[in-house]
Amino acid sequence: MKDTKSKKEGSKDLKQITDFIYEMGIHARTPRSGLWFLGSGEQSVAEHLFRVAMIAYALCHLTPKADKNKVIFMALIHDIGEGRVSDLNYIHQRYGRLAESTAVADIAKSVPFGAEIESAYIEEQARVTLEANIVKDADQLEWVATLRAEEEKGNSKARKWAEIAIKRLKTPGAKSIGKSLMKTHPDAWWFDMKDSWFVDRDPKDKNWKK
């Protein structure tokens, strides 16, 4: 009897995880709606979640006391409900966010590890713990980086929006990164005017092997 019950539970877990995998794919097709009001730019919820997670990971380097694993997991799931209710921008949020909490609760009920998801989501929303504040800061820094890219492409509203987002930052590390983002061109990581490669592209400069 125990073996039969175990097999049934295992089969149920596999079905739930399979459905979860497919559901997570919808975030790549769910647009971030704040850019509609900005008037330029496109971004999916999945793109946002990925960069938030990477920023949160980097912020842990500046805040060694933080639980890195908790931070990364929290960052990955902080907008998980948006696949069901869509992204809610600041105008939408004036009229409530209850649907998103319900969506996360329903997702949690549908998978064997749902308690972890719901607990992390609730902690992130409360923004009391160090880890939750780091994730929220990462969320804002991702938005700042997105806005800076739009500013450099010519959107005259983006700068003011970014300046407002900077004011929401809580942790010292995030505030320092925010200042750096505001004065660094989005292409600076790859485009170096002092690098002769961008002028003559001489293979000799790169020591390529034949």
Where are these regions (language model features)?
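Alpha-helical, largely C-terminal catalytic domains
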Residues: M1-K210
